[in-house]
């Protein structure tokens, strides 16, 4: 699965549950981002750079959470439960 970060133009490539690759618009490798500790990647959500991650345990009553991707910094931020 692929998604273009609307802020940076970087390409996010999701391969399996543990591989998020960041590529330049020309396809050159920029960095890899690991899933947050205790989570695995599932799929992209919505139109932006947001991923659903599945948790090993519940947090605030939810296992699946949406994480916003900062492709330029190589970070993920938990933003909301995934429905």
Description of each model-found segment:
Residues 61-83:
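Acidic, proline/glycine-rich low-complexity IDRs
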Residues 17-23, 59-68:
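Structural motif
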Residues 1-7, 35-48, 81-83:
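Repeated scaffold domains used in trafficking and secretory/extracellular systems
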Residues 22-37, 77-80:
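Aromatic (tryptophan-biased) beta-strands that constitute blades/sheets of beta-rich domains
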Residues 10-11, 40, 67:
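Residue-level detector of beta-strand structural context in well-folded domains
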Residues 2-15, 47-60:
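Short beta-strand elements that form the blades of beta-propeller/WD-repeat-like
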Residues 14-15, 36, 54, 70, ...:
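A structural detector for beta-sheet-dominated domains
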């Amino acid at each position: 699965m692929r998604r273009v970060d609307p802020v940076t133009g970087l390409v996010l490539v999701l391969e399996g549950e543990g591989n998020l690759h960041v590529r330049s618009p020309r396809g050159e490798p920029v960095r890899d981002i690991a899933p947050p500790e205790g989570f695995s990647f599932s799929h992209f959500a919505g139109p932006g750079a947001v991923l659903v991650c599945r948790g090993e345990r519940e947090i605030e009553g939810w296992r699946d959470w949406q994480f916003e991707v900062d492709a330029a910094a190589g970070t993920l931020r938990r933003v909301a439960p995934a429905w």
